[in-house]
Design a protein with these regions (language model features):
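Alpha-helical assembly-interface signal, strongest on the long, hydrophobic N-terminal helix that forms
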Residues: 1-80
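Short, conserved structural patches
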Residues: 3, 53-205
Length: 205
């Protein structure tokens, strides 16, 4: 009798689905939340990219109020920034940071070229370099802070940090915030004569 009961229990599969469901569900939920969070980040990145491109075009117009341009970008990102605040660098949730650099032309949007005689990837040991901004020192970013003048090439960058939609990142020990960034490079409208900084040759320290 007892042996028959044991054999019947061994063959009985009722309730197995519930146990399997209980084991699989948490893993599936984590995967779904992680996927949704990634998709939302891609969506936010596309919105930010479009907003920055539009803002960059607005900034190239003579007399443009750059603070108003920034405000428009932040407004377009209201789904991420319920109570936005400016903070540079943008490292905490619901903060944003904008940066503008001006160059004489598109080729200057790069580290100043230098002769790497010792092949260490650094400008040092008296190596000659092209001082694009004529400030006497080698610069990884030779751009001048700000929007620049007529005909200048302006690099506009907006960085936004927001809190993840789901707690998956925190559960995995990662940061509870995500940071996205978008940049646009445009030439200012030639509403006046452009002032070009002459390039001189310098030596690395």
């Amino acid at each position: 009798m007892i042996q028959r009961l044991i054999r019947r229990l061994r063959r009985d599969r009722r309730g197995a689905t519930i146990i399997e469901f209980a084991i699989i569900t948490p893993v599936m939920m984590l995967l779904l939340m992680g996927l949704m969070d990634m998709l939302f980040q891609q969506y936010a990145q596309s919105i930010l990219t479009g907003a920055v491109q539009k803002a960059g075009r607005d900034s190239t117009i003579q007399g443009a109020d750059t603070s108003a341009v920034d405000a428009k970008v932040v407004t377009m990102m209201h789904s991420l920034l319920a109570t936005p605040s400016q903070s540079c660098p943008s490292t905490t949730a619901t903060t944003w940071c904008s940066a503008r650099f001006a160059y004489d032309n598109f080729t200057e949007v790069a580290p100043e070229p230098f002769t790497d005689s010792n092949n260490n990837g650094k400008c040092d040991n008296g190596e000659p370099f092209s001082d694009v901004n004529a400030n006497g020192t080698w610069d990884a970013n030779p751009g001048a802070s700000g929007e620049g003048g007529a005909g200048s090439v302006a690099l506009y960058t907006m960085t936004i940090t927001y809190k993840h939609l789901f707690p998956v990142a925190t559960m995995l020990g990662w940061s509870s915030t995500a940071t996205i960034q978008a940049s646009t490079l445009l030439k200012n409208q030639p509403y006046a004569t452009q002032a070009v900084t002459p390039t001189i040759t310098g030596t690395c320290p």
